[in-house]
Amino acid sequence: MLDDSLYKDTADEETKKYLRMNYQKKSRDNARTPMQWTAGHQAGFTSGNEPWMRVNDNYTAINAAAQTSKPDSVYHCWRQVLEKRKALKDIFVYGDYALVEDNEGTVNEKVYAYTRKAAGGETALIVCNFSIDKVAWKFDGKASEVLVSPGGKTVKDLSAGVINLGPCEAIAFLV
């Protein structure tokens, strides 16, 4: 953090410029904004007229209140993920991790897939498309239950042993 006394007591403009530049490099202020709670005044972050950091312009559309009211929001997706993790601790907390290769025996550059297997044998397959392209990913086995699918996939969608994932889409299901 910038030492105020050092900065204020420095008469040399070049030193002030150097101190300011180093502060900006190390500060996290340029990477965050006030939490956007509501679409109201100052995004519900403060009742004051002006927070010390500017509220993002999109606060009327993107805020916590808007997320909690939309069933297909990021908020509800992560709520579902955490509920499943809590309900299936033997798999997701204590289960063994294994990286899954595609059917050609190679690791797909666009897809990150892995299993979590409980001591009792229950297994979840998690498939994440980290690309901006649609991906058809083949898997061995049969899906018995879709746990989390932001894209709305069902067991029927997985019945052919192929998962069609949209850009940046993921799915978790029991096999």
What spans do the regions from the language model cover?
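A broad, low-specificity signal marking well-ordered, structured residues that form hydrophobic/aromatic
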Residues: T33, Y112, L125, E145, ...
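Short helix/strand-capping connector loops at secondary-structure junctions
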Residues: Y59, G151-T154
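Residues immediately flanking
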Residues: N129-F130, V175
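Charged, E/D/K/R/S-rich low-complexity terminal regions of large eukaryotic assembly subunits
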Residues: T68, K142, P150, E169-A170
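Beta-strand-rich binding/interaction modules
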Residues: K134-G152
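Loop/helix patches that line or flank the sugar-binding groove of alpha-linked glycan CAZymes
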Residues: M1-A124, F130-V135
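Short, flexible beta-strand-to-coil junctions
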Residues: A118-A119, G151, V175
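C-terminal beta-strand-rich structural cap/linker in extracellular carbohydrate-active enzymes
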Residues: D157-V175
